[in-house]
Amino acid sequence: MSADAAAGAPLPRLCCLEKGPNGYGFHLHGEKGKVGQYIRLVEPGSPAEKAGLLAGDRLVEVNGENVEKETHQQVVSRIRAALNAVRLLVVDPDTDEQFRKLGVQIRGELLRAQAGPEQAGPPAAPGEQGPAGENEPREVEKSHPERRELRPRLCAMKKGPNGYGFNLHSDKSRPGQFIRAVDPDSPAEASGLREQDRIVEVNGVCVEGKQHGDVVTAIKAGGDEAKLLVVDKETDEFFKKCKVVPSSEHLNGPLPEPFTNGEIQKNNPETLAPAASESPRPALARSASSDTSEELASQDSPKKEDSTAPSSTSSSSDPILDFSISLAVAKERAHQKRSSRRAPQMDWSEKKELFSNL
């Protein structure tokens, strides 16, 4: 009997949203004394409003997964994991109450089974793309261009009674300033800001390489409004492969291509060229030897090593003879300092030797 009664009851709605520049445009919250997550506010002209989402709707499924018993943060994480598009199965309060009285659990299968003949009715508004069964392959088809178009996001927010509602921190393992946490129902959450996002620009000014205090100061300088250009981890890695700093031009403009070998080969010599031009000879010395102490030695140390190396192989070259009698020469110089007046006698003997050689 419950199935027959459910056939005449209003149906849940499947709302397919595509993220816009300011996010999806709805606020999610939990109500005291009630189980589940509810739509608190739908912004005018937003993707949520166009998809047919209504304030007061209860969220049943996110991308085909039941979320009725999940916490607020778990539901938010599921929605964020959907990248730029999400499918929400929702029910309005009247429909929710009728299904509870009938003892029927709301599921996506119920919508597919009973909504087919009634697609011309009210449920057709959020599902203009076709029945729920047809939406799934289309979403799969969209997943490929979404991955190719990894773009930064512009999160515009106005300060509320408790501030913007996000925490900023720096990660020792990665350069930059990151979003550590986003408070539920905060201006930051409404703007589409996500945990682990990296801030690229603050109010149109690039903050790449800035310290934590500088970024905080830039945000505070905006007064009660802030526009943060951010990238998630995947988008950040994409732009790093392209060796391009994300900017507001990449919100809708052309994206760089990271997977061409030509670009990588052009960029690599630029980074290696300064090191090679500054000290080419030490670079060759490092490649020829695995001894790390050579890197800290001066240019005189290789000369000593070059001179000592052949000493064990030959004894006919003059430099080696000089090194072999270095102690004797030192002693002679010491004696010469002590008895410098006896030097002329040595000069006469040297002159005789020179004359004989000539």
Curated annotation (Swiss-Prot):
Question: Which residue range or ranges hold the PDZ domain?
Answer: 14-94, 154-234
Q: Where are the transmembrane segments?
A: none
Compartments, as annotated in UniProt? Cytoplasm; Apical cell membrane; Cell projection, Filopodium; Cell projection, Ruffle
Write the record's keywords in alphabetical order, separated by commas: Acetylation, Cell membrane, Cell projection, Cytoplasm, Membrane, Phosphoprotein, Repeat, Wnt signaling pathway
Task: Give one Pfam family, short name only.
Answer: PDZ
Which tissues and organs express this gene's product? Answer: Detected in ileum, duodenum and in kidney, where it is found in the glomerulus, the proximal tubule, the thick ascending limb of Henle's loop and the cortical collecting duct.
The keyword Repeat belongs to this UniProt entry's keyword annotation: yes
Q: Which domain of life is it from?
A: Eukaryota
Task: Report what the Swiss-Prot or TrEMBL entry states about this protein's PTMs.
Answer: Phosphorylated on serine residues.
- Residues with PTM Phosphothreonine: T292
One annotated GO molecular function is: chloride channel regulator activity
Membrane protein topology class = Peripheral membrane protein
Q: Which PROSITE patterns match?
A: PDZ
Q: Name the residue ranges with Low complexity bias.
A: 114-134, 272-290, 308-327
Q: Where in the sequence is N-acetylserine found?
A: S2
GO terms for cellular component: apical plasma membrane; cell periphery; cytoplasm; endomembrane system; filopodium; membrane; microvillus; microvillus membrane
InterPro entries named among the record's database cross-references: EBP50_C, NHER, NHERF-1/NHERF-2, PDZ, PDZ_sf
GO biological process annotation, one example: regulation of protein kinase activity
Start-end of Basic and acidic residues biased regions: 135-151, 348-358
Q: Where is this region: Disordered?
A: 114-151, 247-358
Please describe what this protein does: Scaffold protein that connects plasma membrane proteins with members of the ezrin/moesin/radixin family and thereby helps to link them to the actin cytoskeleton and to regulate their surface expression. Necessary for recycling of internalized ADRB2. Was first known to play a role in the regulation of the activity and subcellular location of SLC9A3. Necessary for cAMP-mediated phosphorylation and inhibition of SLC9A3. Involved in sperm capacitation. May participate in the regulation of the chloride and bicarbonate homeostasis in spermatozoa. May enhance Wnt signaling.
Record note on quaternary structure = Homodimer, and heterodimer with NHERF2. Binds the N-termini of EZR, RDX and MSN. Binds the C-termini of PDGFRA, PDGFRB, ADRB2, NOS2 and CFTR. Binds ARHGAP17, EPI64, RACK1, OPRK1, GNAQ, CTNNB1 and PLCB3. Binds PDZK1. Interacts with CLCN3. Binds the C-terminus of PAG1. In resting T-cells, part of a PAG1-NHERF1-MSN complex which is disrupted upon TCR activation. Forms a complex with CFTR and SLC4A7. Forms a complex with SLC4A7 and ATP6V1B1. Interacts with TRPC4 (via the PDZ-binding domain). Directly interacts with HTR4.
- Protein name per its UniProtKB record: Na(+)/H(+) exchange regulatory cofactor NHE-RF1
**Coding gene?**
NHERF1
